Regions:
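Detector for Asparagine
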Residues: 23, 67, 97-98, 128
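Helical (often loop-to-helix) elements that flank the catalytic cores of nucleotide-handling enzymes
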Residues: 83-96, 116-138
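Histidine-centered divalent-metal-coordination microenvironment in nucleic-acid enzymes
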Residues: 74-75, 100-126
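Generic alpha-helix detector with strongest preference for long hydrophobic helices that associate
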Residues: 56, 94, 110-111
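DNA replication initiation on ssDNA origins
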Residues: 1-72, 80-90
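Short glycine/proline-enriched loop/turn "hinge" motifs that connect secondary-structure elements
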Residues: 62-68, 95-96, 102-107
């Protein structure tokens, strides 16, 4: 499973994002779950992926490699009032339009929509697709 996950989320290798989810808190104004996050400052390894899959650490892969190519991308669907956010509206639009995305509930309570390609494409191409997708969902 680990190797398949690495292949599906193949992106920047020289660095990766992290989030300290065990030290998070809920923002009293927005209801959003907030965590300390940033760049790890080191190369991504198979061990990092495995620890992520085991739930031992939270990592974020930058989709764009050093050549400006991607095999996946994501958009974040958020609400200003997280406690009132319901993904149902978006899931219905995705299903009705047979959109090629994988919806995943985010740590903060929003929704991430992932799109994957069979081969690497220019990041700008996928970014344009995601922008149009976001417009469709609003």
């Amino acid at each position: 499973m680990e190797q398949k996950f690495i292949k599906i989320f193949d992106g920047l290798k020289r660095d990766y994002g992290y989030a300290e989810i065990t030290n998070g808190y809920k923002d009293s104004t927005t209801g959003k779950f907030k965590v300390k996050h940033g760049w790890a400052g080191k190369q991504l390894t198979s061990a990092d992926y495995l620890e992520h899959l085991k739930g031992e650490k939270s990592i974020g892969i930058q989709p764009c490699d050093d050549n400006g190519m991607v095999s996946f991308g994501a958009i974040d669907i958020d609400s200003k009032a997280y406690q009132d956010f319901s993904p149902r509206k978006y899931l219905e639009i995705i299903e009705k339009n047979n959109l090629p995305v994988v919806p995943v509930r985010s740590k903060s309570g929003g929704l991430h929509l992932y799109v994957h390609t069979k081969e690497k494409v220019k990041a700008s191409f996928l970014r344009n697709f995601l922008d149009k997708l976001l417009y469709t969902l609003e």
